[in-house]
């Protein structure tokens, strides 16, 4: 006979963390089985649930679409989204800037959500990672934690 608590635990779905790819200076995650709208909504919730405030949303896709033909490009890059959500966490930002006042350029943090024109059914989430800054490691962990919660 299997104990009741074992049955309860076995019915819980535990998802493994998704693994990002490091592409250039960005960590890029592919979130299968989710729509852009779901991911964008979940990202907002994940940031706010951690007590942070979104300071701005950069509409990168709109700028790319608006300027493509003027620059000689025939096709856009992004199918939907193409937004970067900007926010900070006071304690981590304080530590980063007290380590080096010029780290102000690394704040706010940004997480981008988008689908590609070439792959409209895949939702991507990405963020920048500065090269080898020890003081940025807690921020990197925070950003990964946020994306992992969005992926669940």
Place the predicted regions along the sequence by residue:
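Bacterial N-terminal signal peptides that target proteins for export
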Residues: 1-2
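Compact, glycine-rich, soluble single-domain proteins
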Residues: 55-106
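C-terminal partner/receptor-binding element of secreted or periplasmic proteins
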Residues: 124-152
């Amino acid at each position: 006979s299997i104990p009741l608590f074992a049955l309860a635990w076995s019915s819980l779905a535990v998802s493994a963390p998704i693994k990002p790819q490091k592409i250039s200076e960005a960590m890029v995650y592919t979130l299968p089985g989710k729509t852009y709208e779901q991911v964008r909504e979940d990202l907002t919730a994940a940031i706010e649930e951690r007590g942070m405030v979104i300071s701005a949303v950069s509409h990168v896709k709109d700028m790319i679409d608006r300027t493509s033909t003027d620059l000689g490009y025939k096709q856009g890059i992004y199918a939907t989204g193409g937004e970067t959500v900007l926010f900070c966490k006071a304690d981590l930002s304080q530590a980063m800037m007290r380590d080096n006042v010029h780290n102000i350029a690394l704040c706010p943090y940004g997480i981008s959500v988008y689908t590609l024109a070439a792959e409209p059914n895949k939702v991507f989430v990405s963020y920048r990672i500065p090269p080898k800054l020890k003081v940025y490691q807690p921020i990197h962990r925070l950003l990964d934690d946020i994306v992992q919660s969005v992926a669940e």
